[in-house]
Amino acid sequence: QVMEGYEPVQGDGPLDFDDVWKRYEEMLDWVVGTYVEALNIIHYCHDRYAYESIEMALHDSEIVRTMGCGIAGLSIVADSLAAIKYAKVTPVRDETGLVVDYVTEGDFPIYGNDDDRADDIAATVVHTIMSKIKAQPFYRDAIPTQSVLTITSNVVYGKATGSFPSGHQKGTPFSPGANPENGMDTHGMVASMLSVGKLDYNDALDGISLTNTITPQGLGRTLDERVANLVGILDAGFVPDDCAEI
């Protein structure tokens, strides 16, 4: 048990979405509070013991302080909640009663495929966490921001985390940033871009990343084809529908 005062899901039957979401939000209150408290301590100690006087001497006189927070594993959380909501997820417990795995029956929407059912859950998770972050007191009245960025900790976190209702296995890396779960985006690059585009930037002003890889051969056979297809992908993923033609 990581912390006291939080009751686990009871019984061996299928998980109920509303019950899980309620418990998830309660747990987020503790996680966010502990996280922000740690950040406040870190920045206080940095100012006290390693103040960056040279850097601050070169800074603008009007200082706007921000506090960068971040989340990882967004796609796994979104897919797991979608599985609980739209499929049948039954927890598997060990001899102590601890949930160590899940049996998921039926289909469920997957984040990263331009499916509003899963994408809306992802956006709600980001918004909920940022709302809880904003409610915390910050060192030197810093303005809190949140990132959903590609960082190497997605590998470390995965090694220390158990299995999920989405099918993500214990000890395996999280997908980076706001990427869909590894291997779960089946509708192409543009669909994944459209899913990520549904995350509200106001909830993640520190940045949202989507890491995609494509070979030149995958874009087309000739240089002209590759240029045209790459432009088409960028236009489809980044140019709003109501944007005026340039």
Predicted regions and their residues:
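Acidic, glycine-enriched catalytic cores built around paired aspartates
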Residues: 1-246
